[in-house]
Amino acid sequence: MLESVSVDLQGNNFTLLVIQTHTTCTSQIQLELTQKIKNSPSFFSNNTPVVINVENINHHDDWFNLYQTISNIGLFIIGVCCCYNKKLKNIITQSGLPILTKGNIIKSHKNTIKTNYTKPTFDDKTNAISKTQTIHTPIRSGQRIYARNRDLIIISNVSSGAEVIADGNIHIYGSVRGRVLAGASGCEQSQIFCTKLSPELISIGGYYWLNDQIPPEFLGKSARFYLQNHTLIIQHIS
């Protein structure tokens, strides 16, 4: 008689936002976080999971105040990263929160803009993406599309609150208001092409920008994203 299996252990990849503070002033942190949430209401919701980068936190009182401030906003703290203070690490560990390594979390870099369409060069080996998935219908709020081991072409709109993911490149011939994640399996040579840009999030190979990090002159326009030296680069498409 075969035994029934009640539990499976599965590996998976999840996108986590990291909050890094550059001040211990909780009122300022609360004000800026609240504004970011207001600017991207479909991306954030009650209990949105986040990781806190505590690299700039050295005193346990600052940690407790920061934890309380972020929790009161409605975000759900699932762990911390970049904890190099041994005393603080012990306090956080005893509270039950895991301390994550940088490899577990999604990364963010400053805006970089290039106006000329020059082909980028990369040091990493190219991941083999041999197929393409094409979608001709709108991607509605709440929908999630994942093109595993292939490129993704969407000939329609991506609504706010929707998420489109591909291990390869992503082409969107329509309005983009949701989340777009290319190179989901780690391929940093993946690119994103959009004809009408206004996304909640853009990510390639784990490096991402939120809407308010995208230079305003690109919003509503056609644009191309790619990575160069682990930095996101955006260009106009004429």
From Swiss-Prot:
<dbReference type="GO" id="GO:0000902">
    <property type="term" value="P:cell morphogenesis"/>
</dbReference>
<dbReference type="InterPro" id="IPR007874">
    <property type="entry name" value="MinC_N"/>
</dbReference>
<keyword id="KW-0717">Septation</keyword>
<protein>
    <recommendedName>
        <fullName>Probable septum site-determining protein MinC</fullName>
    </recommendedName>
</protein>
<comment type="similarity">
    <text>Belongs to the MinC family.</text>
</comment>
<comment type="subunit">
    <text>Interacts with MinD and FtsZ.</text>
</comment>
<dbReference type="GO" id="GO:0051302">
    <property type="term" value="P:regulation of cell division"/>
</dbReference>
<dbReference type="Pfam" id="PF03775">
    <property type="entry name" value="MinC_C"/>
</dbReference>
<dbReference type="GO" id="GO:0000917">
    <property type="term" value="P:division septum assembly"/>
</dbReference>
<dbReference type="GO" id="GO:1901891">
    <property type="term" value="P:regulation of cell septum assembly"/>
</dbReference>
<comment type="function">
    <text>Cell division inhibitor that blocks the formation of polar Z ring septums. Rapidly oscillates between the poles of the cell to destabilize FtsZ filaments that have formed before they mature into polar Z rings. Prevents FtsZ polymerization.</text>
</comment>
<dbReference type="InterPro" id="IPR016098">
    <property type="entry name" value="CAP/MinC_C"/>
</dbReference>
<dbReference type="InterPro" id="IPR036145">
    <property type="entry name" value="MinC_C_sf"/>
</dbReference>
<keyword id="KW-0131">Cell cycle</keyword>
<dbReference type="InterPro" id="IPR005526">
    <property type="entry name" value="Septum_form_inhib_MinC_C"/>
</dbReference>
<dbReference type="Pfam" id="PF05209">
    <property type="entry name" value="MinC_N"/>
</dbReference>
<dbReference type="InterPro" id="IPR013033">
    <property type="entry name" value="MinC"/>
</dbReference>
<keyword id="KW-0132">Cell division</keyword>
